[in-house]
Design a protein with these regions (language model features):
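Short, well-structured alpha-helical segments in soluble
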Residues: 1-4, 131-143
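Periplasmic-binding protein-like
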Residues: 3-11, 30-34, 87, 142-152, ...
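Short beta-strand segments enriched in small/hydrophobic residues
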Residues: 6, 11, 50-52, 83-93
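Flexible loop/hinge segments that line or gate small-molecule binding clefts
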Residues: 20-59, 80-84
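Hydrophobic alpha-helical segments within soluble ligand-binding/sensing domains
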Residues: 52-82, 130-131
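Short, solvent-exposed amphipathic alpha-helices that sit
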Residues: 60-67, 95-114, 129, 133, ...
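Short beta-strand elements in bilobed, periplasmic/extracellular small-molecule ligand-binding domains
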Residues: 111-124
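Conserved small/polar residues in nucleotide/adenosyl-binding loops
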Residues: 174-178
Length: 178
């Protein structure tokens, strides 16, 4: 009879991570969470037997903001002293989406930039949904939109399609500064 040496788990919702730990911990089986980072308290509750392996979404978000700062206008295309943006967000319960959203803007504000969010869209990692939402945003806000932030590449591709269809030019495809 074979047992389990370790569980490798890619949680759909990180809010379920504590339940997973509580269920598995009596057996003493180690747990490795991948792709979606559970709260630190979850990892601490099964110390030495539980870890996360994956990208640091805080760093990913910070990098997005830093890329904006590297452009000629630093995201302030109209020169009014404020970066206006829309945000295409992934799953609201996904900590990676939360961190990417927070830290992309934090990079701008930490650099002294004033920011204004025109709208946040819940696109759940979906290219088609992001494409529709960005098309709607461009119709509603037009030239006010200077930056489009997306929590993942699929949504960014959808956003880019709408930007191009609206006759706008993306200054950089890495972060969709318009």
């Amino acid at each position: 009879q074979q047992g389990v040496d370790v569980l490798v788990i890619n949680p759909v919702q990180t809010t379920s991570a504590q339940t997973i730990v509580d269920t598995v911990s009596p057996s003493g089986t180690p747990i490795v969470f991948i792709n979606r980072e559970p709260e630190e308290s979850v990892l601490d509750s099964y110390k030495g037997k539980c870890c996360y392996v994956g990208a640091d979404a805080r760093q990913s978000g910070t990098y997005q903001g830093e890329l904006i700062l590297e452009t000629e206008t630093q995201g302030d295309i109209n020169g009014d002293g404020k970066v206006t943006y829309i945000m295409c967000k992934g799953d609201p319960e996904n900590i990676d989406a939360q961190y990417r959203t927070e830290y992309s803007i934090k990079a701008l504000t930490d650099a002294g930039k004033a920011v204004e969010c025109l709208y946040e869209y819940l696109d759940n990692w979906d290219q088609t949904t992001a494409q529709q939402d960005v098309a709607n945003a461009l119709a509603q806000y037009g030239e006010k939109i200077e930056v489009v932030f997306c929590n993942n590449d699929a949504m960014a591709l959808g956003a880019l399609q709408s930007i191009q269809q609206a006759g706008r030019t993306a200054v950089s495809y890495t972060h969709l500064t318009l």
